[in-house]
């Protein structure tokens, strides 16, 4: 194993619902021997509605505390939060780097029809997500630019 693959590593998986984050995050978890943090999974397990933003924020804070402990001891972590804002991605990168971790960003995107079809097929949302919400999300989501991607490390596993 090379030095870059044996050091602590944070993989941030970013994108809108239905973009394939969970599929990629599970793959990264297996390939890297990482711990994957997904608020959706925890909320499902705890019987919390996925639209409960206060609970989601608390879960993400707890997940980040655990992730930092893992990174500080040389572990590998996959964050599957969506990370819609550049400021959030920058903060994760900065904090992980301060712990000596390499940090990679995986940005996933898909057409609105594909996002809607995937979200509808999985049927996790209650109430169901209306199609118009996806257009609103695309407007709110800050897609990573080449400028933002530059300070991230090269992913060990390509998307």
Where are these predicted regions, by residue range?
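A structural preference for long, well-packed, hydrophobic secondary-structure segments
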Residues: 13-19, 27-28, 51, 86-91, ...
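Conserved substrate/cofactor phosphate-moiety recognition/catalytic segment
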Residues: 19-75, 117, 121
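Glycine-rich phosphate-binding loop used to anchor ATP phosphates in small-molecule kinases
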Residues: 55-104
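Glycine-rich loops and low-complexity Gly/Arg-rich segments
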Residues: 36-38, 60-63, 102-105, 129-133
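Conserved GTP-binding G-domain of TRAFAC-class P-loop NTPases and closely related GTPase folds
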Residues: 2-14, 19-22, 27, 31, ...
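Conserved Rossmann-like nucleotide-binding pocket used by diverse enzymes
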Residues: 12, 37, 79, 106
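ATP-dependent NMP and nucleoside kinases share a basic, alpha-helical "lid"
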Residues: 45, 83-126, 140
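Pocket-edge positions in alpha/beta enzyme catalytic cores
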Residues: 51, 55, 84, 126-129
